[in-house]
Amino acid sequence: METTGIVRRRTAERVRDALERLVTERDVWVATAHPDHGPHQVPLWFLWDGHAVWMCTGATSVTARNVRKEPRVRLALPDTFDVLLVQGEAECFPDQEVPGGAAQEFAEKFGWDPRVEEGSFLYLRVVPRTVRAWRGEPELRGRVIMRDGMWLEQRPSLADAPLSDHDPQPEHLNS
C-alpha cells in the first residue's frame, strides 16, 4: 500500500471526517454472525441520524435472522484506504414500528420507502459503541475514535500548539 505523503490526522479531525462520511455516504457493509452458521456480510444502504446508523433489510433475510440471535454487528464503509469501522448492537424494528422520523428520512434519502412495499421489512438501528478510522499505515496508531459510545477528543499539548505573538512564551523559551 502506498502511504508516502500521508499526514497523520489528529483525533478531532478523524471524528469530523467520520461524521461527514456517515452523513454523506450511501452504502455500508454489514457483518453479522449466527451462533450456529457463522459470519455473514452484506452491503446495505444506510442513514445516519446523528446518533445511530439505520438500515433496512427483508424481515426474513439472513441478516435479520442473525441479528435477532446475535445483535452484535460491525459496519464498514466501502473505502479500503479511508477505513471507517463501526461496532455496536443492532436493534430490530418492524417496518411499521420505526420510532421517530427515521423511516421517513430513510425514504427521502433513497427515494425508496420499504413501508409501502409488498412483503415485510426490518429496520436495523445500530448505536455505535466503538468507531475506528484510519487512512493508511501512518494512521493505524490512534485509530479508535469512539470508545464505549463516547467520541474521543485529542487535547492539544503545548508542543502541538503554535506559538503566536498573543500567546505568552513558556518561561524556558524566554531565556
Label each PLM-derived region with a short phrase.
Residues 49-50, 62-65, 93-94, 141-143:
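A short local loop/turn or secondary-structure capping micro-motif enriched for an aromatic residue
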Residues 14-17, 41-42, 60-62, 111:
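A generic local structural motif
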Residues 2-29:
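Short, basic/aromatic recognition patches
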Residues 33-35, 72, 111-112, 131:
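Short beta-turn/strand-loop junction motif enriched in small, turn-promoting residues
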Residues 25-59, 65-67, 73-78, 85-87:
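Short beta-strand segments
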Residues 20-24, 68-69, 107:
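Alpha-helix boundary recognition
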Residues 1-10, 82-175:
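Charged, gly/pro-rich active-site loop segments
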